[in-house]
Amino acid sequence: MHDLDHYPKSTQKIRKQLEQTGLVISEYLPYQKPLKHHFPERNRLISGLSKGVLITESTIKSGTSITTNCALEQNREVYVLPGSMFNDMTMGNLMSAQEGAKIVISPKDIIDDFD
């Protein structure tokens, strides 16, 4: 699978592993450059293909927040790590919790929820 224009380039190592043993999908043609509106569309796929998503850090306006909103709309489980209301990097987590995401403090919380 050498004909896709991957973004970001920093994911090359894990991408190579996925190409060997997993699956790489795209809604776009090979060599199509990433455009701003592609990212929310990609995030919709990420959440749609998942049983649930774990949010570790998210600002109020971020790609992570878009993924969270997509997951909630798709009736996926959304888990968030708690954060400080004084930290911009976790304000998205707190807002997601208000919108229905489950607060978790250990991996066991998620495992128990899946059982």
Regions found by a protein language model. Give the residues of each.
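Glycine-biased, small-residue-rich flexible motifs in mid-sequence functional cores and linkers
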Residues: 1-115
